[in-house]
Amino acid sequence: MILVPAMLIALLAQLNVSSTFNRYSRMASRRGFTGAQAAEAVLRAHGIQNVRIERVSGRLTDHYDPRSNVIRLSDAVYGSNSSASVGVAAHEAGHAVQYAVGYGPIKLRSALVPICNIGSQLSLILIVIGLLLYSKPLFGVGVLLYATAVEFQLVTLPVEFNASRRAIASLEGTHLLEDDELRGAQIGRAHV
């Protein structure tokens, strides 16, 4: 059964992101730029002026919303000057850059997100109901929807890696972090 290994992999990935962020969030960057300032600098470096940066509640709830042209940074990232926060903010700005330059894979990903979100939310419900009712068809549909959500994550890995590459290149080009601090900024890669 592929469901349990896929769930374990997802859990381990989330734990890795959280522990990596925790480790590097305690290390203040020497230049003192916050996550919000880093995102703004990356956008400016690419000539992007129509994207807003907002604070959102939560922890590691950071994302770029292409529908409203807003980078939303969590409390742990927005005002923090750690290399991890700068890296996460730059990664999200990297997604805004992808849209600005017309990066094809991000457009495909955006088209698939609503469908995969619905499937992901329904999958576990259908699996549980299928198990409770001994219904193979419901269970099977739930597993199929979950597998589709996992496959979607795999398909979007190139988009995430590209955003991280853009983020690190921008951080190097804008000198927001010292060279030895870039390792902590690569949380965006773990964020994948």
Label the predicted regions:
Residues 1-20, 130, 136-143, 149-153, ...:
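Hydrophobic alpha-helical transmembrane segments of small proteolipidic membrane proteins, enriched
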Residues 15-119, 151-189:
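Polar-ligand-bearing catalytic/cofactor-coordination segments
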Residues 113-136:
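Post-HExxH zinc-binding segment in Zn-dependent metallohydrolases
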